[in-house]
Amino acid sequence: MGFLNFFKMSGPSEKKVPVEQQDKVYKSLRFQTFVAGTIGYSLYYVCRTGLNVVKGPIIQDGFLTATQLGAISSCLLYAYAAGKFVNGVLADRSNIKRFMAAGLSVSAFTNLVFGLTGLWSTGVGTASSLLVLLLCGLWTLNGWAQSMGTAPAVIGLSRWYPLSIRGTYYGFFSSSHNIGEGLSFVFCGALVGLMGWQWGFMGSALAGVLGVIIILLFMHDNPESKGLKQVELLTGEKTQEEIDAEAAAKAAAKASADAEAKEIQKSVFKNPGVWFLALASGFMYVARYAVNGWGVLVLEGKGFETTQATMIVSINAWCGIFGTVLSGFLSDKLFKGDRQLPALVAGILHVISLIIFLYGGDSVAINVLAMILRGLAIGVLICFLGGLMAVDIVPRKASGSALGIVGLVSYIFASTQDIVSGILIDKGTTVVDGVKHIDFTQVGYLWIGAAIISFILPLFNWKKRQKAL
């Protein structure tokens, strides 16, 4: 019970904040929670994507093959897909500070162990089958730990921010994975270039420790635990009488509401439009994680040094921020709430960027252009195909079920991509004078084909609209 109680949501504090100080204290603590969640999750992503930076040097060292790296990478995504659902449910009833810090601590530890294993391996040579299995287990643990990051940060916004401004702060938080991915490519890429691939993991572990410290210092579980009233009362959204009346009404209507919710959720699973979008998102995730995971290796194959290659790929992450922000503006203002046309345009742009990246040669300008276009396109597609378009065609009460289906399919496809891409890359690898050369033609067909399918499938939903429930 002691372990479970450690993660239990904090109860109200006996020490109350004086009325005249409540507004000032509340605004300070809620902003700290937002900053801690955003920075903390950005550093989660550094611990998640470090392996993407070092695949080329690992292959050249002969420590692991592309097939083995693909299998290890897929373990993280499979575990993340399963853990995201489970930990999302657990986080709702947890102390979000401790929950989020615990996940990042474990993730930092797995990166440290991977790096130390690499340092030890320099005197051993190629990894044995047993060591590969152990690394798969280690990265599975990392995937599960990574799934403990998103929910606490989002729940923090829900517990501390009123509905009237929550969306604005959620928009800023949504850029955290782009920030983390960009930091990973720049920071870890520099360490790899200076000190070797093992130190890329060391850098990720250090970033994780920094994130844990920030979360523990600045994230707060809920207003009540700090001697404040609940957020609805603090912000004037509701009176105590309204809160009590709603609680009583919910208790009285719980049985019928539960039955209705189950029927609505069943209808989502029978909705072919949701599955078209889930598959579309899955194929988009194939292309997304292909470049995120193997893009540095592609550029190294063109002759770029690791540090330069990681800098170029990081541009994709930074531009993704603008793509995400742009997606909402475009659909709401320019297209009057229509997601399908901008998603189609972004899908075509995504394919064009992949073709330029894979077959545009070794010009820095051309590859930078490809990453700019891809970042903008992926930012839009993650927002639309990754969930919003599915939410648009189901009853409001079934939004969570639709998002769950899309998310699960997306990560299953992304995980499988890592395995298949690794096998195809190994098949395209030749050794000339002791140096490995990789032909990306076959795997490039896979990535481009997936991107094409991802923008064709949503066309089957062109005239579908949300059911007003």
State the predicted function of each range.
Residues F173, H177-E224:
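Helix-loop-helix hairpin linking two adjacent transmembrane segments in secondary transporters
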Residues T49, L77-F85, E181-G182, A317-V325, ...:
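Residue-level signature of mid-helix packing/kink "hotspots" within the transmembrane helices
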Residues L51-K55, N271-V325, I382, G387, ...:
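Extracytoplasmic gate region of multi-pass secondary transporters
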Residues E14-K27, K226-F276:
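Juxtamembrane intracellular "pre-TM" segments in multi-pass secondary transporters
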Residues G337-L388:
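C-terminal transmembrane helical hairpin of 12-TM major facilitator-type secondary transporters
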Residues S105-S128, I348-D362:
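C-terminal ends and interior cores of transmembrane alpha-helices
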Residues L138-I179:
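Cytoplasmic helix-loop-helix junction between adjacent transmembrane helices
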Residues R93-L104, K333-G347:
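Cytoplasmic membrane-interface "Motif A"-like loop-to-helix N-cap segments
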